[in-house]
Every structure is written in C-alpha cells, then in structure tokens.
Amino acid sequence: MTKHIFVTGGVVSSLGKGLTSASIGMVLERRGLRVRMQKLDPYINVDPGTMSPYQHGEVYVLDDGSETDLDLGHYERFTSGKLNRDCNYTTGQIYLSVIEKERRGQFLGKTVQVIPHVTNEIKRVIKRMGGDDVDVVITEIGGTVGDIESLPFLEAIRQFSLDAGRENCLYMHLTLVPYLKAADELKTKPTQHSVGQLREIGIQPDVLVCRCEQSISRDDRDKIALFCNVEPEAVIEEKDKDFSIYEVPLSLVDNKLDELIVKKLGLTSAGSLDMTPWNDLLHRLRNPRHEISIAVVGKYAEHKDAYKSIYESLDHAGMHHDAQIRIGRIQSSDIEREGAERLLSGFHGILVPGGFGERGVEGKVQAIQFARERNVPFFGICLGMQTAVIEYGRNVLGLEKAHSTEFDKDTPHPVICLLDEQQNVIDLGGTMRLGSQPSRLVADSKAIQAYGREEIDERHRHRYEFNNEYRKAFEDAGMRFTGLSPDGGLVEIVEIDSHPWFVAAQFHPEFKSKPLKSHPLFTDFIEAAINRRKQRVTEEIASETEKPTAS
C-alpha cells in the first residue's frame, strides 16, 4: 500500500516547504524507498507559464513539456525521479477538469460544488501518484494555512485519509518559530495558532517542522508539543542555513525525522541510511581549492528566484571542481546605462540566461561583445544564444541592425526568427516549443567534448530560432553550429573556435543538473572560468616581475 505524506505551511509564506519536501524525499530514497513528489498550487492560473518571474520566480520545464513551479526543480535535483505533468496541479487545472466533466454531462445533472466535486478531483490526482512501483508519495500543498485559496486542497487531504486509511497518511506542518531580539526568546504562539487553524479544518498534524533562527530549547519543544497535540519527538527543529541549502537533508537526519516517518508510516521495507555521497558533497563545498566569480547578466537579476536553476547549476559545477562560485547578478538594463566594461571587468566567466521581451536585450548584446572580445568564458542559454547570434551578426559579419523579429519585426537582417510551427499560434499559454527534444552534436566541438556522446536530449522553452538563411554567412565568419536537431533544421548550439570557451545553447541545460551530477556544459564552463582565473594570476605575476626596480 502506497503511503502518503502531506506537507503544509503556516504562519508566513516562503518557509521553504519545497526544499524541505525535496530533502525528505532524498533521505527516504537513501533508505531504499521509492518516492514520488507532487506539488499542488492554489492559484487559478492553469500553469505558471505566462506568469512574470517577479511574481512567481522561474518556470521549471519538465521532459514532457509541462511548465511547472520552481519547487519541482528542488524535487528533481534532490531525488532520482523524473517528474511529469501529474506532479504539479493548480487550482486552475482542477477547476478546468471539473468544468469540462460537467460540460460532458459526467455529473448526471447534479449541482457541481466544491465539496464533493472539486475535492474529489483533487483526491483523484493525488491517488494517481501511487501504485505498486512507489512506496511513498510526498504531496506539498502550496500557500499558507488560513488562505482562502488553499481550503479546497486542505479539505481534500483531510478526506484522503478517510479513503486511504489514517495509518497510510502522515500530515507534516512546516511552521515558523520567530526569535524576538528584544525579549531574547523564541515565540511559539504563531505555531500554536497555525496548528489550531489546521485542526479547525479537521487535520491533526503528526509532525511539526519548525523553522527558526535560534535552537529550540527542550522546554519550548515540550510546550509546542503540548499545545499542538503532538509528541515531543515529532517537533523537528529546522534552523536557517546560511552556508548552503544542501545542509537541510543532514539537519533533518540529525533530528531523526527519517526515523520518525518510517516509524509512523510503518515503512518496514526501509533500509539503513547512507548519506556518504552527500557528506562528501558538503565537504567539497566547505573546502574549495578555487574561488571564481561568474556574472549572470539577466533581465530579472534582482529577483533571486528568477534564475534559480541557473544559480544551482553553477554551484553544482563548482562543487564538481572544488570551486567556490561568487555569482554577480547583473541587470542587463544596467549595462545599457553604465557599460559592460564598468560592470563586467573582473569576472572570470559571463553567463547570459533566457528571458522574454525587448527590455534589457541591448545590454545582453553588449555583455556578449565584451566576453567575445576580451576572451572571457561565455555561456549563453536560450535568449542568451539568440543574443549571441545577434551580436556576432552585427559586429563580426557587419549586418547593420541585425536583430530578432521578436523585438524588431522590420529588421533588415532577421538572424533570429519565429519557428515555422509558431506562425499561426495565437494563445500564449503552453504553446511554445516545450520539453525534451533530441539533438546531434558535431565532432571536434566543445559540446561533444563536454557530453562525451553524439546524441543528447535537452529541455526547451522557446518560440524563436536561428534563421537558416544566414547559416553559411555565419559559418564563413567563424561561428560553428555544433548542435542541430536530428533533421539538421534547427540550430541548438553555437560555438566560436577562436575563443577559449564560447558556447551558447537554445535549450535549458540548467533543468537537468543535479548536486551529485553536474550538467556537462556547466562543468566545462566553470573549468574554463578556473583556467581564466589562473591565466590572469599568471599575467599579474609576470607584470609585477617586469616592473623596473629602483636603482
């Protein structure tokens, strides 16, 4: 029988339910259990695909083309499972499914209501995650207890234990125990009230995971347990991690959360826990042999979640090379005002990620020109590849006003144009070229050197592509097209051989990087940045040596 863990959050938002859920999934996998992850989001959008990064953070794309919440990135990075569209549902999807069933007459003339029809649909998508090939399903409920948007989901998971059996369900509530500096004490009252709201709905938490700045004393732990009706050992401390999010699983293990879950759910098939690879990972993170700085030049750089997977992938590659990565978040629009020289000098590598819309595009072009002309390792992703093509067209081929038709429909040199399949598309949501697509790599390229194989599959999210009418001109001018779709029609990777490391990809490699298995393109990019730093140190030493001495 599949066991279910439901993770809710209270007191405030942004407590880290996704990271905690992913950490639990990883630890249970380390005990030999088969785990599936799911996120239920209470917003009415069908998916986050059309939401602003400032509102929602990055959109995380799955192999099947689903545009999902960024928490699914945590799930895939921490656990071994490949997720699909069943792993992320929104209120919009749930209501859409219910309305479509009503239109087909599946409710036989009944009045369609939140209870039972909407809650039944929610229970259906949760139940579908189980099966003979899975031991534990971890379902995270988005939002905060007390929000009106979350009520149907909370009611559904309350009912779910009646259907599946209370012994097969575990309710875990993530809460905040704030520290008041003036009183020099932790306050448990917000947690008590949050749990009280859950109990009013009919859910008694089995485990409380308490986010805190300071350690929770035994007295406070006993107090929380008493007022929230849980056992003292079920009050789990989760202190803030200033060093790395990859400490979270070890913190939960130190608090014996995995043992508690195994005990409460009767997971007799669970084996002993081996966290050796994770401990080794953190050892490398704490003891770097190199320190390099990478500039991420983006449209949404001031919002830390907008490029979440990019930053994590850089850290993965850094750990692979025993390197500490200092990330400079540079607004591309700032480069337009202040210049690339002022903002980018001193970085050992430059990465230009994806984005939509014209704002800041010229700043990206200037950043790429700086990287190309100064021989700074450069990595372009999605729009980063397209702007690399635009920059090369303007400044190397001499194609004045070369641009993408996304930003200038009347450009005399449309080096980037709309995909043929997108010509008649009107709707924005879910209509891009999405999900995993195959590519073939060209021999004697940096791409094939990184991957070590000719055929790859990577995740995409775009409407525009390189215009093949310009392919020969670019090749003659020194830009190589080293990754192509199987039919050769779509450009997937571009490189410049005369540059130490200049690689740009139309796809999103950041969605397939993991802490214990860094993505090969990120791995080689960071290696190039390390070499750049070594070269600069050598040049500085040589310069000092050549200075004349006083007579």
From Swiss-Prot:
Pfam families (UniProt xref): CTP_synth_N, GATase
Residues annotated as binding UTP: 13, 187-192, 223
PROSITE patterns, per database record: GATASE_TYPE_1 (PS51273)
Ligase found in the keyword field: yes
Active site: 382, 508, 510
Keywords of the record: ATP-binding, Glutamine amidotransferase, Ligase, Magnesium, Metal-binding, Nucleotide-binding, Pyrimidine biosynthesis
Enzyme class label: ligase
Entry binding sites for L-glutamine: 54, 355, 383-386, 406, 463
GO cellular component entries: cytosol
GO function term, MF aspect, one: glutaminase activity
Binding site for Mg(2+): 71, 140
Top-rank taxon, per record: Bacteria
Catalytic reaction(s) noted: UTP + L-glutamine + ATP + H2O = CTP + L-glutamate + ADP + phosphate + 2 H(+); L-glutamine + H2O = L-glutamate + NH4(+); UTP + NH4(+) + ATP = CTP + ADP + phosphate + 2 H(+)
Chain intervals for the UniProt region annotation (Amidoligase domain): 1-267
Protein task: Catalyzes the ATP-dependent amination of UTP to CTP with either L-glutamine or ammonia as the source of nitrogen. Regulates intracellular CTP levels through interactions with the four ribonucleotide triphosphates.
Family: Belongs to the CTP synthase family.
Designated name of the protein: CTP synthase
Organism from which the protein derives: Rhodopirellula baltica (strain DSM 10527 / NCIMB 13988 / SH1)
Organism ancestry: Bacteria, Pseudomonadati, Planctomycetota, Planctomycetia, Pirellulales
Gene, per the UniProt record: pyrG
